[in-house]
Regions:
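Short coil/turn connectors at secondary-structure junctions
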Residues: 33-36, 63-66, 93-95, 129-131
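C-terminal lobe/tail of nucleotide-utilizing enzymes
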Residues: 86-159
Length: 159
């Protein structure tokens, strides 16, 4: 299902005189069952509404897939990401990795933006030592440090 308005799916669907099909939401992944790896992208966080009574966490639980938590590499990233990790675990979800994404080019910062982002990732890694933490720099095609995504996915599924 695709809705035009940049609103939550329930609000956007209502604005179009439609509704979110909860069955399709949960079974749409079946079309990809022959693939080795499937990435299901969520938006808005674990507690964003996807349907009238369905939250992102509900869908993640129903699909049984490990989570990759992504946040912008900026002030507050540790708190937001740690909150998401703890919320996911409280919901019985497995977190396979955390990614800090540099969403725009580096700006001039007295302490050096690169060092701040690296320190942020290192500080989070201390707080969640069992979860790989990485950075995706603006314009980069690989993660820093590299992540073995296959291993992360398998560890998440086996938990």
């Amino acid at each position: 299902q695709v809705f035009r308005a940049p609103l939550s799916p329930p609000r956007s669907s209502r604005a179009e005189g439609r509704h979110v099909d909860d069955h399709l939401l949960r079974t749409g992944i079946e079309a990809w069952s022959g693939c080795e790896i499937v990435v299901v992208e969520g938006a808005g966080g674990l507690f964003s509404p996807l349907g009238k009574t369905t939250l992102g966490a509900d869908l993640a639980r129903d699909l049984g897939l490990p989570l990759v938590i992504v946040d912008a590499a900026r002030l507050g990233g540790i708190g937001r990401t740690l909150c998401a990790v703890r919320a996911a675990r409280a919901e019985g979800l497995c977190v396979a990795a955390c990614v800090f994404s540099q969403v725009s080019p580096a700006t001039t910062h007295p302490a050096g933006e690169e060092a701040l982002v690296q320190d942020t990732a290192a500080d989070l890694a201390v707080l969640v030592p069992d979860v790989p933490v990485t950075i995706l720099w603006h314009g980069a095609r690989s993660f820093d440090p590299p992540i073995d995504w296959w291993r992360a996915a398998m560890l998440g599924i086996s938990d």
